[in-house]
Amino acid sequence: ATPSTMTLDLAANLGEVTRASGNLTIDAFGFLQVSGALALNKSTGSVKLGDLASTTEVNESTNAVTVEQLTIGGSGLTAFAGINGGSSAPTGLSLEGVNFAVAIQTEKTPAQGQTAREWTAVKASATGANFIGVDGLVVTSSAINVEITRKAADNTLVDYSAQNQVVQTGTLASPSTMTLDLAAGLGEVTRASGNLTI
């Protein structure tokens, strides 16, 4: 047998890293089918917070917070949610060209007696969405974009505009990324945009 080699090339400044990626197809009880490239990364890092107006004696943005970072990303996904998915007569929502990034940041060393703070951010896009399976009803959408941020229990938010978070969304063989860049000054955000035709 011919010996083979594998190169280990992770940078030490990444700290301990757990990383997985690949092409995946999921069928959840016939209701949800998703197929495409997915990536998961777990590592230690730091984030900058936005300053809270309610705490005039403290500027939360001056010190970075060390966190455990869990990121999940996907690219080029197709998805269907509804009934009879994969059959000749499906009814539900069909999505194409889905890309998404999720970052969950958990404080690594909370203040004594305090619970670790946790912040979540989501960014997603899709090139198209169609509602199919109901005669006479045509719903199509394109250029869909979604952004969500969630604050910690103490009302702080990660300021992604001060320190962007790049999330791997593709496989190592076919790399792609998505950047989280929302400013903490916007507060918690839930927003979506796109072109809709009914």
What residues fall within each predicted segment?
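N-terminal low-complexity, acidic/Ser/Thr/Gly/Pro-rich segments
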Residues: 1-198
